[in-house]
A protein has these predicted regions:
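Post-HExxH zinc-binding segment in Zn-dependent metallohydrolases
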Residues: 136-148
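Active-site recognition of the HExxH zinc-binding catalytic motif
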Residues: 116-129, 143
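An acidic/histidine-cluster motif and surrounding catalytic segment
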Residues: 24-34, 47
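Zn2+-dependent metallopeptidase catalytic core
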Residues: 37-56
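Active-site scaffold of zinc-dependent metalloenzymes
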Residues: 69-111
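N-terminal, Lys/Arg- and Ser/Thr-rich interaction peptides
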Residues: 2-26
């Protein structure tokens, strides 16, 4: 069973409710590299064609090298999962190390790493959306597996 195509969320979300918003949205900091922006937009377009996003989820693409998670750790990506299904979640990914990654691994691998981070955080979206009962370790393992 693929959690990205699971429809357990239909029990919890009324997509016909007035004011309900759906879809995957991309938001970019001004300093994000144009090639990163292009790759993320292209990936998002493909994701929209392949998967349903019944609850709007914005992905904030940050120009920072790392972003601070809720626990204080500096990380490449985060996902905010609200307690209520009436509040929209969001993901953030850090892309400020793109040029360094290009030098170390080449452009294709650098972009792949950023897109893998985005897929990882969106897997957390589908875990939240379908209300899967996993341990924190289980959530990370599943997100890592689905992203790769």
């Amino acid at each position: 069973m693929n959690i990205w195509t699971m429809t357990r969320w239909k029990k919890y979300i009324d997509v016909d409710a007035c004011g309900h918003r759906s879809g995957l949205r991309m938001r970019f900091d001004q300093g994000v590299d144009p090639e990163v922006r292009r790759a993320c937009m292209e990936f998002a377009k493909w994701l929209r064609q392949e998967y349903e996003f019944p609850m709007r989820v914005p992905v904030y693409v940050k120009a920072a090298v790392r972003i601070r998670a809720m626990d204080g750790d500096m990380v490449c990506g985060t996902f905010f999962r609200p307690y209520s299904m009436s509040v929209e979640p969001y993901a953030r990914i850090a892309t400020g190390d793109y040029l360094d990654l290009c030098e170390e691994r080449g452009q294709d691998n650098a972009l792949a790493e950023i897109l893998l981070c985005m897929a990882h955080e969106l897997t957390h979206y589908f875990q939240w959306l379908n209300q899967l009962n996993l341990t924190p370790v289980g959530e990370e393992r599943q997100a890592k597996r689905y992203a790769h």
